[in-house]
């Protein structure tokens, strides 16, 4: 191979093969060589060419088909099939399944016969019973869901159709990460021959093979309106037989099938199926296989219903986990037409149901009835008694029927698919009432609580939920998992996660969980599932307890913060009240002050008083200054008037015109002499520091401004 070439980086090649398992190995090697081990360029190129291999578009060579992803082994070791080990891949609603989901290897067949598997026409095949999924608004050719059976009249042509098989192998002890359903994406619809229908027929390998039970599903675009009963029975084998691997084959066509009949089945399959048939005279044969994961090609207009038997007998709760060998399961997948609603059309005027169920077992097995009309109290009991024999425990049944009565209002309400776990209905009226509830809103699913009702033909009572499903919007994919005593796990989108009632945290918010009824446990069943259930319950309980502790601590912290915020709010309110009261008081004072404004006369009197007070203040100030300058000998009382010394010191007034007498002359001389004496005693004049006026040396204050001399 190309891995031996030294120019190829083995690490890059291994990474690309892990990321693009659907691309053949030689294409990956050529891409690595062309891009010189450039991981980004290789990823870009392989992303473009991946849809051609993934959806089987165009023509493929033998090498491409040989390297195509054909087998998915979930939990099966490599030496079980003796095939080449590859990376663990799966399809779970997307292109591949993560390695953490599926730990088993991917086995690639070495021969091209794995793809076509030609079958001999030695065993005649009867005309298949078909169930038409047709539109009520657009007159398009119907596309059917048929269930092939073995042991009828007529022969099928030996020509094998062009199918691309995908094998799903489930180990007995699969992990909890194993996917519960396998979605295979088909190409876009291409008109009338688009593969929108799937046919299921049994296929059992040789007794010496490692795989015990298988089923095949193939698409067919034609209608085969025949009235036959098809029942799937589980082998009443010992407990050791459950250790074998359970395999489901899902065929995805490369193009529209050219063969409209069901391919024949090997003689070993027919002989083993006929030998296990409890009703050989009815013209229908029974085969032994267990359907686990079946999906149609297109993602749109798909309704998948998966049923599982109860964990502990009839009426008890069953965990919807990944597939395990001790638990039997039936899966019915239907693909509707590309219209705004889904209907199950009646087939050729007969209401014989197509049953998929278990018979001859000591424990309860689910039974599926696909009927073109709702079961009634008159017809359901006889059919149930004929199809399913009485068992020690009740067998829950689920009906798929279409509300196609003429009195339903015609086009007022869209057709409704009614799924019920009990055939005891109140006639078509009850179905019409449920259908009227579901006629509103696109993709609306309504769940009714389970009610205890007698199970017809089972010899006991069964409590199971019933679901009314409408699909007016064709853009979504619905996966509905129904189990006795369990509400269905409904998920719009690609695939629904595993529904486990023990893990209450994974339930939706609006999910109403029904309490399981107490019944006698099955010792052989408990041995296989008890350790896993106990470990899962312990993990879920520990996780729940830790989550509760975390939420309580968070609640206490938030409560404490809330108390602090409340206290701060109260304090702020008190401060605001104080400030508002202070503002009100100030406003009142201001208003009162305006009322107390004095009059003009009062203002004049106050001004006079202020003037007198100012004079008194000045006098006292001058006296204090003189006392400080004159010293302790200064006596202000001896000065009658402080301003007397500040008289007129100008020139002497002129003498009178009369001649003076001697006395006057002598008095005048004496006065002149007196006046001249102080002039002789005068010193240097001093200048005032305030007004720079030259004052007499005898003055202690300025004559102009009365400023002190020594200040």
Curated annotation (Swiss-Prot):
Please give one Pfam family short name.
CUE
Question: Lineage of this protein's species?
Answer: Eukaryota, Metazoa, Chordata, Craniata, Vertebrata
Query: Which residue windows does the record flag with biased composition (Low complexity)?
Result: 262-287, 312-353
Bias (Polar residues) occurs at 119-134, 252-261, 288-299
Source organism per entry reads Danio rerio (Zebrafish)
Q: How does it sit in the membrane?
A: Peripheral membrane protein
By its UniProt entry, which PANTHER family does this protein fall under?
A: TGF-BETA-ACTIVATED KINASE 1 AND MAP3K7-BINDING PROTEIN 2, TGF-BETA-ACTIVATED KINASE 1 AND MAP3K7-BINDING PROTEIN TAB
Keyword Nuclease on entry: no
Q: Where is the CUE domain?
A: 8-51
Q: What does this protein do?
A: Adapter required to activate the JNK and NF-kappa-B signaling pathways through the specific recognition of 'Lys-63'-linked polyubiquitin chains by its RanBP2-type zinc finger (NZF). Acts as an adapter linking MAP3K7/TAK1 and TRAF6 to 'Lys-63'-linked polyubiquitin chains.
Residue runs in coiled coils = 550-630
Q: Where does the UniProt annotation locate this protein?
A: Membrane; Cytoplasm, Cytosol
The protein here is known as: TGF-beta-activated kinase 1 and MAP3K7-binding protein 2
Location of region: Disordered: 118-142, 252-414
Q: Which UniProt keywords apply?
A: Coiled coil, Cytoplasm, Membrane, Metal-binding, Zinc, Zinc-finger
